[in-house]
Curated annotation (Swiss-Prot):
Protein name: Xylose isomerase
Oligomeric and partner information: Homotetramer.
Residues at which Mg(2+) 2 binds: 268, 271, 307, 309
Major subcellular site: cytoplasm
Organism encoding this protein: Haemophilus influenzae (strain PittGG)
Length: 439
């Protein structure tokens, strides 16, 4: 097989003093931190769609990226070539996982029969490549938003035949994920929302997507899939109002349909930005609600109101993200998937390596800094002191339901309670965090 990235053999760890652009400065896969290797902590994955499918097009211009496999008039042969190049890239980068949508890996064809045949054909190839390389599938999913049939939604579509088509794709993608040993299955409602209530039955659409998710859970148990089901929140884009706005909204949806024990969340940094939240907030919320599953690692631009899907480059932001994950015990089946794309001016094929190497080093350094914060209890001691009153008899009685509004009102009057404000010490804590990050 001809090498596409023939200038390099394998990306390796060379340390902080290295000036080699094709080397890791901080990511040492075998370095042990808090009892696990970096590789075990981060569980890195490359996404198929942005990395191997996007041609650099945007709303204002045609594709700018030269991708030889996209020029093949035989679309299935092009998909085979794409699989070869994808696994060459994955192997040389040295990441353990990848992720895909069904139509990322295989052409959809002109009928449902062609869709199924093409998809199964490429899954056969991916299965062989996984055996050959040891690279595994972090998660699979179905693209139920690109085809025009989904312009009014998939599970939320006013036409039940479109609902059935989406079910067909998810059925096949879940089965393929199971076959390939995928550790999760993701559901992103790309067009599960609406543009205007003038033509929308909101209650009905919520019931439709609720039933769809119940069917997904039923199928998971029917086929014996041991992985985790994940919903990926996003507030808007492509629709104006998305039903899976943020982590808290998703949790309310799961509770409504009795799915809170069955489905967790896959959190994307850029989606948190669009929702008006910090990345750290979304992860902390998911951990507090016990629905934290996996991460789509990228970044957005606070000045832009759309999904820019840039590679993560902030150690400051990701140290706090990593801190929340470590506090929660780390990933189980999830990991860091780079749902990020190079800029459309980055037309050199090796820009893909620069982007991933830099992002991986950012996560590795963030992991080291977060581990130090956790070990030294940089923040936790102060947080524990701040809430110490809730460990008192009064605090425990309130939490255990042994008090009422009336008994508390009587207590305050009897003891003439006059609690004094205590400093939140935000500036001091920010200084402590910076000391760790820049040490």
């Amino acid at each position: 097989m001809t090498s596409y990235f023939d200038k390099i053999e394998k990306i390796s760890f060379e340390g902080e003093k290295s000036t080699n652009p094709f080397a890791f400065k901080h990511y040492d896969a075998n370095q042990v931190i808090l009892g696990k290797t970096m590789a075990e902590h981060l569980r890195l994955a490359v996404c198929y769609w942005h990395t191997f499918c996007w041609n650099g097009n945007d709303m204002f211009g045609l594709g700018s990226l030269e991708r030889s496999w996209q020029k093949n008039p035989n679309l299935l042969a092009g998909a085979e070539q794409k699989a070869d190049i994808a696994f060459e890239f994955l192997n040389k980068l040295g990441v353990p996982y990848y992720c895909f949508h069904d139509v990322d890996i295989a052409p959809e064809g002109n009928s449902v029969r062609e869709y199924v045949q093409n998809f199964h054909h490429i899954v056969d190839i991916l299965e062989r490549k996984q055996v050959e390389t040891g690279i595994q599938l972090l998660w699979g999913t179905a693209n139920c938003f690109t085809n025009p049939r989904y312009m009014s939604g998939a599970a939320t579509n006013p036409n039940p035949e479109v609902f059935a088509w989406a079910a067909t794709q998810v059925f096949n993608a879940m089965n393929a994920t199971q076959r390939l040993g995928g550790e999760n299955y993701v559901l992103w409602g790309g067009r599960e929302g609406y543009e205007t209530l003038l033509n929308t039955d909101l209650k009905r659409e919520r019931e439709q997507i609720g039933r769809f998710m119940q069917m997904v859970v039923e199928h998971k148990h029917k086929i014996g899939f041991k992985g985790t089901l994940l919903i990926e929140p996003k507030p808007q884009e492509p629709t104006k109002h998305q039903y899976d706005y943020d982590v808290a909204t998703v949790y309310g949806f799961l509770k409504q349909f009795g799915l809170e024990k069955e489905i967790k969340v896959n959190i994307e940094a850029n989606h948190a930005t669009l929702a008006g939240h910090t990345f750290q907030h979304e992860i902390a919320t998911a951990c507090a609600l016990d629905i934290f599953g996996s991460i789509d690692a990228n970044r957005g631009d606070p000045q832009l109101g759309w999904d820019t899907d840039q590679f993560p480059n902030s150690v400051e932001e990701n140290t706090l993200v990593m801190y929340e994950i470590l506090k929660h015990g780390g990933f189980t089946t999830g990991g860091f998937n780079f749902d990020a794309k190079i800029r459309r001016q980055s037309i050199d094929p090796y820009d893909l390596f620069y982007a991933h190497i830099g992002a991986i080093d950012v996560l590795a350094l963030s992991l080291k800094r977060a581990a130090k914060m956790l070990q030294e209890e940089t923040l936790q001691k102060i947080v524990n002191e701040r809430y110490a009153g809730w460990n008192s008899e009064l605090g425990q009685h309130i939490l255990q339901g042994k008090t009422s509004l009336e008994t508390l009102a009587q207590l305050v009057q009897q003891k003439d309670l006059a609690p004094k404000p205590v400093s939140g010490q935000q500036e001091y804590l920010e200084n402590l965090v910076n000391q760790v990050i820049y040490s």
